[in-house]
A protein has these predicted regions:
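A glycine-/polar-enriched beta->alpha junction
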Residues: 36-46, 53-69, 102-120, 130-137, ...
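Periplasmic alpha-helical coiled-coil/stalk elements that build and connect Gram-negative outer-membrane
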Residues: 138-252, 366, 370, 412, ...
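Amphipathic alpha-helical coiled-coil scaffold segments and their short linker/junction regions
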Residues: 35-39, 187, 192, 222-299, ...
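Bacterial N-terminal signal peptides
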Residues: 1-9
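Short segments within alpha-helical structural elements
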Residues: 64, 197-224, 379-439
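Small/polar, glycine/serine/threonine/aspartate-rich low-complexity segments that form flexible
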Residues: 16-26, 73-107, 231-243, 272, ...
Length: 440
């Protein structure tokens, strides 16, 4: 009875156990999704964002430096007495107890008038923004390459699977025809060799697809998730604008050119800043508060207590005019140093302009050639498919040799892979071109 009860309880527990949750379905990513994920994980891109934010803070600090600053100060000065004078042993103080509690307004008039430091910080922010855009476009090209490497890997894997099935079908046909005495045994051997070659090609295509998935997962997922798919949009490639339009976009939207121009402007401002070091500097400090022998609104002065209590609250103003006279040529050296950097920035701007024009023409021609190649390969795929179909029928009818059939199978596989590579080549050419022009 006890055994029956225990068995029943065990069966009840097994029945009421909750079912295991099904594994989550793998997510499917578009190229846009991949780009957004990569921007959240790429260290160099995040570093460029950090540099841009830091440059923005530099600009805020330079703007604040042109305005008056307000600080508060509270001190107690205790001086050892000498037993004779109420001022104590230090002549700088007028009593053994001194209390200071005031607010100080400071203004640098040269920074407010010249504005050179503020403008220099603005150019620094412009450089950082341009470098951020360079990083963004470079990351987009990298992700696009990895994305379509996986996509073409999947296509080639499917092509290899289809070629393997065709090789198996050809082997079966050869064996059947051999049994009927219609073809020699050499046809079966050739078909078997072709089938073995396609098996190896299938394994290689799977390895290439898995490797491409790993490469893309590194860019997209912090947890290195490999359970994802990609949307096949190779047939939706953007059209290629006219070269004149591309050239105009590059002139206005190229971040390398923007960074080089901003660097030249910054170098010119550095020369001005170096020269302005020879100008007089004018500052003012206005203090308002108390500096007395007692922490109070009114108190007696330790040096002359007979006068009674006097007001402690008041102000004093310090205006300073500093004239640089002699520094052993340091300021002149800094001017020459800044001028050398300005000339180098000018040289780099010229080199950047030439490089952009060279890359623009080269990448545009690459995109044009790739687009024409895609059109040609699309027709080749249709012809190769028809050739395989006809050679298969001719071989079964005894009108074609096994070599012709194997050659048709190999040609179709090669043309399909070439077509996939051609489509990816065009997409990558467009992505590289967009690093110069921006999206179009």
């Amino acid at each position: 009875m006890l055994l029956w009860f225990c068995a029943g309880a065990l069966a009840s527990a097994q029945v009421t156990a909750p079912p295991a949750a099904p594994p989550p379905a793998p997510q499917t990513l578009t190229l846009k999704d991949a780009l957004e994920r990569a921007q959240m994980n790429a260290p160099q891109f995040l570093a460029a964002i950090s540099d841009t934010n830091a440059a923005r803070e530099d600009l805020l600090q330079a703007r604040a430096a042109r305005r008056p600053s307000l600080t508060g100060k509270s001190e107690y000065l205790g001086t050892q007495g000498n037993g004779v004078f109420p001022s104590g042993r230090f002549v700088t103080n007028d009593g053994v107890h001194v209390y200071r509690d005031w607010a100080v307004v400071h203004q640098d008039f040269m920074a407010a008038v010249l504005k050179t430091g503020y403008r220099r910080a603005g150019e620094g922010e412009a450089i950082a923004k341009a470098k951020l855009e360079i990083s963004r476009r470079g990351l987009a090209a990298t992700v696009t390459k990895a994305y379509y490497a996986l996509l073409t890997g999947q296509r080639k894997y499917a092509t290899a699977q289809q070629a393997l099935d065709q090789a198996k079908q050809s082997l079966d046909i050869s064996q059947r025809l051999e049994r009927g005495g219609e073809v020699p045994h050499s046809d079966v051997v050739k078909s078997d060799l072709q089938y073995a070659a396609q098996e190896q090609a299938f394994r290689e295509s799977k390895l290439a697809m898995d490797t491409a998935r790993l490469d893309l997962a590194v860019l997209l997922f912090r947890d290195f998730d490999q359970s994802f798919g990609v949307v096949d949009d190779l047939n939706l490639a953007p059209a290629l604008p006219a070269f004149a339009e591309i050239q105009t976009m590059a002139e206005h939207e190229n971040p390398d050119l923007q960074a080089a121009n901003a660097a030249l402007r910054a170098a010119r401002l550095d020369v001005q800043i170096a020269r302005q070091a020879s100008l007089p500097s004018l500052t003012a400090d206005l203090a308002y508060g108390i500096e007395a022998n007692a922490f109070a609104w009114h108190s007696t002065v330790a040096a002359d207590p007979s006068k009674g209590k006097v007001p402690n609250l008041g102000y004093f103003l310090t205006v300073s005019l500093n004239l640089p006279v002699w520094d052993w040529g340091t300021r002149s050296s800094k001017v020459r140093q800044a001028a050398l950097k300005r000339e180098q920035a000018n040289v780099e701007l010229s080199a950047t302009q030439r490089t952009i024009m060279r890359n623009l023409q080269g990448l545009y021609q690459e995109a044009q050639t790739a687009r024409e190649q895609v059109d040609s390969l699309r027709r080749s795929v249709d012809l190769a498919s028809e050739s395989l179909r006809l050679n298969g029928l001719r071989y079964q009818a005894g009108e074609a040799t096994i070599l012709e059939l194997v050659d048709a199978q190999t040609t179709l596989t090669q043309v399909r892979n070439a077509y996939d590579d051609g489509q990816v080549r065009y997409r990558l050419a467009v992505a590289n071109l967009q690093t110069l022009t921006g999206a179009f």
